Amino acid sequence: MDPVTQAPAPEGVDAPEIDESLQPFEINLYLPKRPLIPSAAASANGLPETPSPLKVAVTPQETLNDLRVTITDSPEGYWLGAFCFRKPLASPNSTAKGGKVQLGERVPEWTELREIFEGVDKDKRELHVTHVPFNEADARAHVQRLRDLLSGGAADPSAIGVDAALSVQDAVRNPQEWQQDAARQNANGRAVTKKGVNDAAEASSELPLPLVDWAGWPSVTSIDLIPQVARRPRQLPVCVRQLSLASWNPPPQHCKLNGHLLYLQVGTLEGEVIFVTASTHGFYVNRSSGARFDPSPRPDGQDFASCSLFDLLCGFSPLFLSSFSKLFNDPLSSRDYFSAVPVTNALPAFPWLARNHTHHADALRSQAAFLLTGATSADALEGTRDWNDELQSARELPRTTLSERLMRDRVLNRIYSEFTQAAARAIPKVAAGEVQAMNPMDKRDAQMFIVNNLFISKGADGVDLYPHMGGDEAAHVAVGKDVQGVKTLNSLDVGGLCLLGTIVVDWKGERWVAQSVVPGLFRRRDDADELPEADGETTELAEAAPEKKSPEAKLAQSNKADLNDDTQVVYGGVEGPEVIRDNAAFHKLFHQVAQTLHLNEHQVEDAKGIKHSLWLSVDSKGLRGADGRRYVLDLARLNPVDINWLENDIDGAIHGSSSSPNQDAHYPHRMTLLRPELLEIYWDSEFRKWARAKLAARQEAKAAKDAKAKEAASKEDGEKTEAPEVEAEEPERLDSSEFKLTFNPDAFVEFKVADTLAEEHSKVITPITDESDASIAAVRQASDFLRKVAIPRFVTDVAAGLFTAADGGALSRQMHARGINVRYLGYVARLCSPEAKQELDQELIQKAGPGHEGFLNAFRLTVLQEMVLRASKRVLRGLIRDVEQVNVAACVSHFLNCLVGDKVNAHPKARPSVTPLSDVADAAWTKLTPETLREELKAEIRKRFRFELPASFFEQELRRAQLLREVALRTGIQLQLQEYVLEGKLADADGVVSDGCHGESQTNGNTTNKKNSKGKKKGGNEQQNGVKKSNVGAAAAKPTKAARATSFEPEDVLNLVPMVKDSTPKSTLAEEAFEAGRISISRGDRELGLELLLEGVSFHEQVYGLVHPEVARCYALFATIVHHLAGVAAMERAESINQAKSENKEITEADLPVVNEHLSMANAVRYQRQAVTVSERTLGLDHPETLNQYMNLAVLERSAGNTRESLLCQRRVLELWSLLHGQHHPDCINALSNVALTLQNARLFEASLRVYRSAHELALTLFGADSIHTANLAHELSQAYTLAGDLKTALAVEKEAWRVFEERLGKDDAQTKESEAFCSSLAASAVRVAKLEKEASERQARLPASRRGNSNAGGGAAAITGAGTTASGNGTANKSLDEIVRFIQGGSNGSVAKAKGKSKASRK
């Protein structure tokens, strides 16, 4: 029986319907031979043999084009040029002379594999790859492919950022391999002796475990963002000296007739310059030189003709073959494959500290445009992509079957990704003035641009749409809300409703919007656009036509004078509520959207007094494009307004300020909307209340009915009816459609309308305010819910330890997830103060008990820092907006000096770059000082968050290093990788890390001889913990430079990265498949669940590509589930074995439970490692999610027995905590506990004890002595003291834990009883130890004086302590931790050891 049919599918989830025809299968691929690379040379130089056949795993829905991409990206097929696929002939005589297989016709590229192999047995599915003639596009693509492979990971100056998609996981986990790699080259790139490499390998193999010499939290500085061994860019082998298009291009006409396509110029490592002809039949070395043109082949076989340029170069240049084999077999790619996979479907992460790469000459870099387009003149340029048509065509792809949904999601995600990348590249060009505006006569903020079929405009109020709402400030918010609205509707995926590709880019202080172009957006509207579509949708459409063609409408159409009448808008308000249009088709589509978003159908009156029925906001427009599609625009006000903020906080009180707010503290805009998450949370809360009330009413009615029945039965002499009992057994069911709660999106909204009598010929009205309408009242109730329930509940959860924020970004994301707008940061900060304790949930606060203040204090600092950060962004945005490009770096560095470098230099001076064309004498940024900046920040915080910063915040509470990191990350600043001194005195020399100056010794103390190994190891550990090491040689090689006077200099600013907000939707198919697997496992069907999980992982990879944040999260979740299931499977097998032993039965492997091949710790570790790498490359090296991935990896590595790797990951966790928040964060206690537990499992009890002490001290600092969190740490610390043999201290610490457990949990709690039993055991052990010591002392007294000195080494407490400390003497070397504890306890009370083991298991 098919296992799929054994468990019902989860509701709304299609993934469990596994179709056997859609399951992956293998095909055999036969690749062409490579005659220029003999097999002997291939093996000697490390290039892989061409396998025959090559087995490739594919899915049935893939096309041959997908297979082509897979082959060309593989190590086996990278070298192929132009090729096609052929099937072998199916006839019996298909084998020709020489045993060669006769091949059939070419298989079409876009054919799906299931069609190609329909009816073919799985073991007979094969394809042959054969060469075909090149065309010019094939030749150009092949050359580009060669360049990409030869450049490897070299820095690309054309990228939008430096060190894009950098991963350091391999450097974290394998530092010794990176040290050996560095030891192979000296500073000049020459190879060192083999002895030096062997010495380095030998020294690295003898390294002690990380963190074993714990002496407190390691010293970490910003430069530790990138591990020491990875700070110098890797030097990959150079294969050619030069590769470029020859100056003989393009081929003359008579050569084109002979098949010539391109001419290449190659400088080999042997020093020879050759010219290569690319022809329709491949490549060959020709007779040309720099001064003579002769494209004919070289004679006597010296042309090295080949269908592959790779093979030609391998055959011609032995040094190319040798270097390319080293590049091909890069050990980093083999250890961490995901670090080398190109990022295709997501924007890569750019670290805020980047390495300053040496710029190398590359002639082909500037010729890349020709390789990509083939154009040599303007008229030959290909037409730009029609982004809108691509997006809409992808959305219209069929989605009835699983394979169709998968294909549709793949295509959509790829197009959205390419659209986002194109916009991120185009907007800096527009901002720099490189593109002519469509309306150059308008003011700058109103200008529009079209670049690469992208419609680009500024996110400012250039056309005076929002003067009554706050002008540019309101427009800035509106475009961000519009992107959110587009993303929401993209996720809803309503059929027939088209959405523009939309992204917002913040660049150099300005906000820009890029959209796909609507067909016919600027054409004049005619009568045909008013007619309903003749597609037979509904009778409703037909009824709409007469209304549109009324005489009044015709007259208005013929006498158009208003621009509002000359648009393509057919539904909604044209510009506000004055002109509103109706369209039945759009009304029906918007109804589907409104149902999901809980919006109400409402009436809006236009300027003529006519009422129109709308589902969405009147600002949301329906537009009929020239392509016949229905587009929706302007989704900024998809959610209702926050009326409480408008009424109470626009000019409301400022918390913490004794004075009343002045005009300067006016909130900058009135575009204050509720978040969709809040509406969903509030709707769910009200639905639960309604359901409980309904059930309670039914119970009351039922009880009354039963009472009447009982009374009637008693009157009839005790006769009893059974009907009430039957009804009582029926399950209670509620019809959710009876619950009505919707919101009016136009409630309390202010509109600007024309008024000839007003001073500015306009006035502001609020037409919809009648709260007797339930949908309008619901808007106020949701606003009340936000302030009275959502925010206090959020802060209460923080106090209870249910949520902590690693940094400001994590705080903002969590607030948004709970429906809380960031403008409430000041309100959140107020609730964190002791004075507001009564506003929190007192029941939860009581349960949290003493110590909850520790969570709130750390959280409050994060909230205050986030307010300072957001104010800093606003100030910097205003400063940098009008700065010339030549002064951007100077402006940024001066701003940072005033913000976080004021303790180094209290009076930093601006360093503008003055040229004859620049005038910076009156630039605002040059006049900025730390004092004026602080005043601006305080004013911004007062204005935007209604909060007054404490007077001492900047001096005492500001975490400068963390603020620097977040300002850089959130504004796109990339600084040079070096240590930045933010407090104290500056050093005389910089610690810059670049290709020429590494900032640390290339081979550290670990590679020296054993004689000085002790001192060198100590130095190496200090270096890894972040203490700066000087490099005398590198410093001497640098040119003399004046000492720094400030923390930052203009040269430190490497780049500004565009900050992108996209509208790409998630794939619901991938999420559904994964969720179906989790549901199946929770129901007990482990095999089906695991199969569905693997299918979900595969769907994630196919939709998003291998390197994407969603794939990282999927990998991490899958690794956690596999880890859990592997543990369960291991326990089941152990129980089976133990049961068989207890019954004296012989057990074989067949008798044990079958374990799925995927359920292994090695598999869990592998997926978690992939999750770490992908997270680093797409989210960031120091993103909070990356930190969590490292924490999970450390736990999995420990579970798999990889102690060194686990400790290396945990050291990285400590470094990341220092960078994100600092060491005084509640979650740092868990990080230290994990380190201590790993050391304890490695039997390093003294080191473990030191770490536990640090964790306990931190808990005391944060929570106090009476906190349950401190008591838990004390319990663990007591066990550590026990294992170290210090029973007296262990007893004292455990007594303190027992006291807190008893006070907080009560005497009957299991944790209290465990602590009490452990105290009793420790006390008994202490008495026994004292007795042994007394006996030893008495024996010592009875001995002759000459023998007393030598007899005290073996007895009493020393023996016991030694056994606990080293676990080496007295037969304890091979005992488990529990056995050692029982040994210390004298073998009594084994339950304590068992309980302790459970406690440790729970800590994992």
Swiss-Prot record:
Record flagged with keyword Cytoplasm: yes
Subcellular location: Cytoplasm
UniProt-annotated stretches for the region Disordered: 528-561, 706-735, 996-1046, 1337-1372
Domain Clu: residue ranges: 357-646
GO molecular function per UniProt: mRNA binding
PROSITE patterns cross-referenced by the UniProt entry: CLU
GO BP field: intracellular distribution of mitochondria; mitochondrion organization
Function: mRNA-binding protein involved in proper cytoplasmic distribution of mitochondria.
UniProt similarity note: Belongs to the CLU family.
PANTHER family, A to Z: CLUSTERED MITOCHONDRIA PROTEIN HOMOLOG, EUKARYOTIC TRANSLATION INITIATION FACTOR 3 SUBUNIT EIF-3
Protein name: Clustered mitochondria protein homolog
The organism of origin for this protein: Mycosarcoma maydis
Gene of this entry: CLU1
